[in-house]
C-alpha cells in the first residue's frame, strides 16, 4: 500500500467539500433538453411508479449513491450515513475504492455497511488500472466478499491518474483484463468513468468484454482535475491540472451516445445530476439509473436524515415530472420524447459537429430526441 493512500482519500473529501471543484464552463448538458408539458396526463399522481429492476434487484427509485469514499475515519461515518439512508429510501449504493482495505485490512471497517443496510443493492469498487499493477480476479472477488456486495464496479480514471503526483498510468492491455474479470466473477461487473464520460467507442468495447452495465459518469459535476489541482505539490502540477478543468463529455451527451452504441445494456447516468427533473431527462435520453455523489456527500456530513431529505426531494421531483408528462412508470418515461433546444449536435467520435439548415426542420432551434 502506498503510505499516502488514506491521506489522499481524506484530501479528496476535504477538497470536494471546501473548494470550488466545479467545471468552469461545461455543464452536464441537461439544460439543452426540455419535456413537452402534458396538460391532460390521464393518470393519478399517487399512481406514478418510480420502481425499477436493476441487475435483478428491485429499487424504489432509479437512483444510486455514487461511489465516493472509504479508507478513513470520516469515510466510515459518511458511508454508514449514506447506507442507512439508502436502506430507508430503497435505492442502491456504490462504495469507494476498496484497494485500501485489500492492502491494509485494518481499514475494512470504514467500508462495511451491511450491518446498517442489509437489503440495499451494494456495489464494491476498484480501480481498473490496478489490474495492471498486480491485481487479479481473486483480488476483485475478495473485494466483493469482504463487504458482502452484490456486484463490482471497475472505475476508469486515466486522466485523474495522469494528474496525480502518485498516479498509476499504465492502461495498456486493460480491456482484456477487464474481460477476464467479467468472466471470472460470480457477480455482475459494472464499468464507470469518474467524471469525464464514456464515449460510444469505449462503450462498445466494454459491452463486447462482457460488462453487465455502464456508468457514463460524464462531465458537469465534480471536476477531478480541479481536485487534483488543489492537491498539486508544485507549480507544474497545478498548471497541468488546471488546464483540464473543462475536459470531458457532458453527461447528457454521454448517455445519448452510449445508449445508441449499446442499445440493450443498462446505463447509469452520473455527473452533475442535481434534481429529479434531470433524472427524468436522463432516463428519457436512455439511462436506466442515475448516480448522485456530491449533494449526498454534503448531506452525509450532517446526518442520515439530511441524506434522506435530499434523496426524497429528488424522488418527489422525479414523480412530479413523470406526472407532468403523463408517464405512469419508468418504461413510459423512457419512451417520452424530449425537445433539444440547441441546433448543435455533437458527435464525440472525431470531434465533429453538425448543424441543420432552417429548411431541415420547421424549427432551427429545436428538435425532438430521446423517444425509443
For each of these PLM feature ranges, what is it?
Residues 46, 74, 78, 105-106, ...:
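Short secondary-structure boundary/capping elements
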Residues 83-84, 88, 115-122, 128-269, ...:
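Alpha/beta enzyme core
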Residues 1-55, 59, 339-358, 368:
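An N-cap/entry alpha-helix motif that binds or orients negatively charged groups
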Amino acid at each position: 500500500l502506498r503510505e499516502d493512500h488514506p491521506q489522499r482519500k481524506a484530501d479528496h473529501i476535504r477538497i470536494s467539500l471546501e473548494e470550488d471543484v466545479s467545471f468552469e464552463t461545461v455543464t452536464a448538458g441537461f439544460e439543452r433538453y426540455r419535456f413537452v408539458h402534458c396538460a391532460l396526463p390521464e393518470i393519478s399522481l399517487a399512481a406514478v411508479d418510480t420502481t425499477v429492476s436493476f441487475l435483478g434487484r428491485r429499487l424504489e427509485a432509479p437512483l444510486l449513491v455514487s461511489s465516493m469514499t472509504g479508507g478513513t475515519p470520516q469515510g466510515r461515518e459518511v458511508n454508514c450515513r449514506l447506507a442507512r439512508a439508502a436502506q430507508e429510501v430503497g435505492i442502491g449504493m456504490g462504495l469507494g475504492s476498496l484497494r485500501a482495505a485489500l492492502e491494509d485490512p485494518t481499514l475494512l471497517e470504514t467500508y462495511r455497511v451491511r450491518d446498517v443496510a442489509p437489503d440495499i443493492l451494494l456495489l464494491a469498487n476498484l480501480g481498473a488500472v490496478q489490474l495492471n499493477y498486480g491485481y487479479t480476479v481473486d483480488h476483485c472477488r475478495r473485494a466483493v466478499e469482504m463487504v458482502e456486495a452484490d456486484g463490482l464496479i471497475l472505475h476508469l480514471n486515466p486522466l485523474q491518474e495522469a494528474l496525480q503526483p502518485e498516479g498509476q498510468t499504465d492502461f495498456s492491455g486493460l480491456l482484456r483484463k477487464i474481460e477476464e474479470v467479467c468472466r471470472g466473477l460470480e457477480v455482475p461487473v459494472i464499468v464507470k468513468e469518474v467524471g469525464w464520460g464514456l464515449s460510444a467507442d469505449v462503450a462498445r468495447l466494454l459491452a463486447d468484454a462482457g460488462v453487465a452495465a455502464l456508468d457514463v459518469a460524464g462531465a458537469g459535476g465534480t471536476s477531478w482535475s480541479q481536485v487534483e489541482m488543489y492537491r498539486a505539490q508544485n507549480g507544474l502540477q497545478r498548471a497541468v491540472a488546471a488546464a483540464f478543468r473543462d475536459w470531458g463529455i457532458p453527461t447528457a451527451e454521454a448517455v445519448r451516445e452510449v445508449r445508441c452504441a449499446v442499445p440493450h445494456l443498462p446505463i447509469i447516468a452520473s455527473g452533475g445530476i442535481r434534481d429529479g427533473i434531470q433524472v427524468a431527462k436522463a432516463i428519457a435520453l436512455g439511462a436506466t439509473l442515475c448516480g448522485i455523489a456530491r449533494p449526498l456527500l454534503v448531506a452525509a456530513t450532517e446526518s442520515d436524515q439530511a441524506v434522506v431529505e435530499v434523496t426524497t426531494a429528488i424522488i418527489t421531483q422525479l414523480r412530479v415530472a413523470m406526472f407532468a408528462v403523463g408517464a405512469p412508470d419508468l418504461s413510459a418515461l423512457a419512451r417520452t420524447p424530449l425537445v433539444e433546444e440547441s441546433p448543435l449536435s455533437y458527435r464525440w467520435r472525431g470531434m465533429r459537429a453538425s448543424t441543420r439548415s432552417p429548411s431541415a426542420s420547421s424549427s432551427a432551434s429545436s428538435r425532438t430526441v430521446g423517444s425509443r
